[in-house]
């Protein structure tokens, strides 16, 4: 599994939410209050941290913290 703590840290930093709110089930828009700019910045931070490229099409499919974990795992193989 992708490093959940690292992903959580990025989300907390990018969205300014409390660590306790960042669970695999948390939805970025509905639960964590992210807007479209927040999600773009989050994707960019994830790309930089994990050395991966996330296409716009794939980024649109990432809606929860769990989606990020699965996606990073898949990319890192």
Swiss-Prot record:
Entries under InterPro entries matching the protein: ACP, ACP-like_sf, PP-bd_ACP, Ppantetheine_attach_site
Pathway in which this enzyme or protein is active: Lipid metabolism; fatty acid biosynthesis
Domain (Carrier): residue spans on this chain: 1-76
GO BP field: lipid A biosynthetic process
Main location, first listed in the record: cytoplasm
Post-translational modification: 4'-phosphopantetheine is transferred from CoA to a specific serine of apo-ACP by AcpS. This modification is essential for activity because fatty acids are bound in thioester linkage to the sulfhydryl of the prosthetic group.
Modified residues (O-(pantetheine 4'-phosphoryl)serine): 36
Compartment(s): Cytoplasm
Annotated Gene Ontology cellular component terms: cytosol; membrane
Keywords: Cytoplasm, Fatty acid biosynthesis, Fatty acid metabolism, Lipid biosynthesis, Lipid metabolism, Phosphopantetheine, Phosphoprotein
GO molecular function: acyl binding; acyl carrier activity
PROSITE patterns to which the protein is assigned, alphabetical: CARRIER, PHOSPHOPANTETHEINE
Keyword match Phosphoprotein: yes
Metal-binding in keyword set: no
UniProt superkingdom: Bacteria
NCBIfam families: acyl_carrier, PRK00982.1-2, PRK00982.1-3, PRK00982.1-4, PRK00982.1-5
Family to which this protein belongs: Belongs to the acyl carrier protein (ACP) family.
Protein role: Carrier of the growing fatty acid chain in fatty acid biosynthesis.
Annotated protein name in UniProt: Acyl carrier protein
Organism: Leptospira biflexa serovar Patoc (strain Patoc 1 / ATCC 23582 / Paris)
Taxon lineage: Bacteria, Pseudomonadati, Spirochaetota, Spirochaetia, Leptospirales
Gene: acpP
């Amino acid at each position: 599994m992708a490093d959940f703590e690292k992903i959580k840290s990025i989300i907390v930093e990018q969205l300014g939410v409390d660590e306790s709110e960042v669970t695999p089930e948390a939805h970025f828009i509905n639960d964590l209050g992210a807007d479209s700019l927040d999600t773009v910045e989050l994707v960019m931070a994830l790309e930089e941290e994990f050395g991966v490229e996330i296409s716009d099409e794939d980024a649109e499919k990432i809606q929860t913290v769990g989606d990020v974990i699965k996606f990073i795992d898949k990319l890192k193989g």
